[in-house]
Amino acid sequence: DVLIPRQDTELLVEQAITYIKSVKGNVDVLDMCTGSGCIAISIDRLCENAKVTAVDFSQKALVVAKENNALNKADVTFFQSDLFENVEKQYDVIVSNPPYIKTEEIESLMDEVRIHEPMMALDGDCDGLKFYKKIAKEGRQHLRSNGIIFFEIGYDQKQEVIDLIVKEEKYINTYSKKDLYDNDRIVITKVG
C-alpha cells in the first residue's frame, strides 16, 4: 500500500534534518505525500526541535505510516488530506517526495517497482509534475515567513521543477542538490 523507501530519499532527509537542526527554536514540519512515513519519522526522531505533521491522500498509506510511527517510537501527527485540502495551519518546513514519474514511463520501470509499488505512489501525471505544480502554487499560504520547501525530484526534472517554482513568484533562492550518483535529486526553495 506504500512505496518502499529507497536510497534516493536519503539526501532529501539529510538536507531537511541539517536545516532543521540549524534553526534556533521549534520548527513545525509538514511531510506532504508521506506514504510509509519514513521521512516524517526520521525527522521526528533526529530533530529534537521538530514538531512533525504528515499527510497523505491514501488511508491505506496512513495506516502503514502510523504503524511505523509506533514501531519507531516517534511522535508524528498523521491525517488524511488531498495535498493541502485539510491542512489548516502554517509550517516552517514542507518536505515532499511526491509521485513524479510520467504516466507513459511507468510501463518501462523495473519489474520490482512497476509490479510491486502502488500506482498512486508513482504516477505524477503526463508530465510528472502534477504534484510539484500544486505544492508550489498552494504551499506559500501554508508556510511562515522564511519557510522552506524540500522536494525530491526525478533525475531529469531539475529545470522543469525550478521553472515552475520560479513562475509562481512566491519563492527565492531556488536550487538543486545532487545525490551520490551525481544525479539532481532534490530542489530546495524558500519563501520570498
Model features per residue range: what roles?
Residues Y100, K190-G192:
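C-terminal beta-strand of the catalytic ATP-binding
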Residues Y100-K130:
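Mobile active-site "lid"/loop adjacent to the S-adenosyl-L-methionine
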Residues C126-K190:
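Conserved Class I SAM-dependent methyltransferase catalytic core
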